[in-house]
């Protein structure tokens, strides 16, 4: 693909700069992600993002969602989610490095791809149910694949 791109006259450095530039608010929010995520059980992590958090950092739910893959590099993590308070519901962005999670998302009014899905829960208590289900799913995946 890169060999095809170099046939065109464009400034690669300028393109990369534009792709990598984020606002200071979003940069500070990403630091918040690393500071505030929580490990639920072995192999499962999550982050609850309240309206107050978004207001504090000046970000919206769309910007928040851009950070969901930041937790991917955490050693021993197999599935994780961001739970974003949208007032009358909580949107959950679910990601996985192995366990199929779209069936989990479907159980909670969502869907998506096997390793990247979204769901909606009514409140934080229902998020706990989703996290319990996610932990069971990861546990099964680890046993089936003989991962310790």
What are these model-predicted stretches?
Residues 1-107, 112-148:
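Hydrophobic helix-and-loop "lid/oligomerization" segment in the mid-to-C-terminal part
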């Amino acid at each position: 693909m890169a060999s095809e791109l170099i046939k065109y006259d464009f400034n690669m450095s300028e393109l990369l700069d534009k792709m990598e530039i984020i606002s200071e608010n979003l940069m500070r929010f990403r630091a918040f992600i690393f500071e505030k995520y929580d490990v639920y059980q072995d192999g499962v992590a999550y982050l609850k993002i309240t309206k107050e958090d978004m207001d504090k950092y000046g970000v919206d739910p769309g910007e928040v969602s851009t950070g969901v893959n930041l937790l991917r590099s955490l050693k021993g993590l197999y599935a994780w989610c961001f739970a974003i308070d949208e007032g009358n519901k909580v949107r959950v962005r679910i990601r996985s490095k192995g366990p199929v999670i779209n069936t989990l998302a479907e159980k909670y009014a969502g869907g998506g791809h096997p390793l990247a899905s979204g769901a909606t829960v009514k409140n934080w208590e229902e998020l706990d149910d989703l996290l319990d289900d996610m932990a069971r799913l990861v546990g099964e995946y680890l046993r089936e694949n003989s991962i310790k």
